[in-house]
Amino acid sequence: MDEDSVHGDSHLKTCVVLGGRGFIGRSLVSRLLRLGNWTVRVADSGHTLHLDESDSLLEDALSSGRASYHCVDVRDKPQIVKVTEGSYVVFYMGATDLRSHDYFDCYKVIVQGTRNVISACRESGVRKLIYNSTADVVFDGSQPIRDGDESLRRPLKFQSMLTDFKAQAEALIKLANNRDGLLTCALRSSIVFGPGDTEFVPFLVNLAKSGYAKFILGSGENISDFTYSENVSHAHICAVKALDSQMEFVAGKEFFITNLKPVRFWDFVSHIVEGLGYPRPSIKLPVRLVLYVFSLLKWTHEKEGLGSNYDTAHQYALLASSTRTFNCNAAKKHLGYTPVVTLEDGIASTLQWFSRDLEKSDDTIIQSTADQLLGCGKVADILLWRNEKKTFVSFLVLNLFYYWFFFSGNTFTSSAAQLLFIFAVALYGVSFVPSKIFGFQVNKIPPWRFEISESAVRDLSSDIVVVWNQGVRSFKSLSSGGDWIKFFKIAGSLYLLKLIVSRSLAAFLFTVMSFSFTGFFIYEQYELELYHLARIFVECLTFIKRMVIPVSDASSKPMFM
């Protein structure tokens, strides 16, 4: 449907966008203003309207009077009545400032707020109410959805309480149709993304920053439908005209809205995270194990009274591991909806916006734990492969030394003497090399390179003294016989050293050298994953401990008092 044909007459009509400063609300406001035949009342819970660089169109409209901003709390019906009076249509985009962990507040805003919006529209004589719903209201994660249409029934139980509330709100919108002249419909969009996204893409970015975006839940072959935000806005505007021309098929109905191009969920995620400079997902995890861990962590946090932030992660895990595609034939036929932005162009615009947003953020560069352990100096740069050429040369030189001392057939003393002899001859021979050979400059090693500064000698001497004094104190402590822990530490270390020297010192040194050039590098690459896995392991141990200790305490009590 051509948006310019939404109105048959030329004069401006007034619309209200409730939740107009939310992600999809902003997109709808911009599209309405670009059409030029609307006076837009932007209503949201914020006391003031904060504009940024992308809001130049709204800023001009506010100055010219084609747009106005109103602070409205949907829990307060008189405020809604006031802002909707005289309006032709109300777009209800949903709340933008939910405290997702306060379920009572969420219920008042989502469910009771929807009742207030419906009642206010009827009282103020609004003809059309279009509700921005979600495809989540037919999805509980228990079964895949393939080419689902509007005949799908809502689940009896939802995994997320917020989705349950949204399903209740959608039901209220449908029931309100054709009462006191009010026509209603609901648009169910599937996984909305776009510039200014505050939910899905930021969640992926946070996963990527924490290292979790490297994991694929399940096989990675599941298909999903995504919807670009501007296409959702376009569908809302199409619904306005359709409530007149196709009232019998649109009023009181719900419609699925997508980009009409199902893709693999993990291909989409890979485009986003890789486009923002993060590694693409590559490590597959069993879905059931992940969901069990989420449930365990949620239960532990709730039992400790720490609250829980695992609902979003749990919902994401269900979306990320299930096939979920929808049939939009009803929207195409009765609303005249077709996407105005392709999926590829939508992804490109989203990446461009978030790339600029990430550049503006002042993320402090934090040194990795591996870098700190290695002293954040030249040794760290070599072992962490910051300069691949230097690292390779260092590894090659150490391997040559290793071969020279352990596999040349000479004793350690003989090998050291021969090495010093070769070094001395090389230095002496370099002195006879001309400064230029065939026109190429030969850089000789200056004598000062072999000098050691007095401060370095003093620092080395101080370190030796500190180590010596620590050893003396340790021996004094051992001789007094008071510190058994220290005794076992020293005795164990000496015995381990004895085993290494007596068995195979060469094999031990080779293992240490190989680990140094690989272990620290691997640890730095997967530091966050290892940290979070360790955290989960500790949480599981804590859970097991709480389950076991009460039993132990009960069994230790005497049978007779």
Swiss-Prot record:
Pathways per UniProt: Steroid biosynthesis; zymosterol biosynthesis; zymosterol from lanosterol: step 4/6
InterPro entries on file: 3Beta_OHSteriod_DH/Estase, Lipid_A_modif_metabolic_enz, NAD(P)-bd_dom_sf, Reticulon
Membrane topology classification: Multi-pass membrane protein
EC number, UniProt record: 1.1.1.170
Binding site for NAD(+): K166
A Pfam family per the record: Reticulon
GO BP: sterol biosynthetic process
Designated name of the protein: 3beta-hydroxysteroid-dehydrogenase/decarboxylase isoform 3
Organism in which the protein naturally occurs: Arabidopsis thaliana (Mouse-ear cress)
Lineage: Eukaryota, Viridiplantae, Streptophyta, Embryophyta, Tracheophyta
Annotated gene: 3BETAHSD/D3
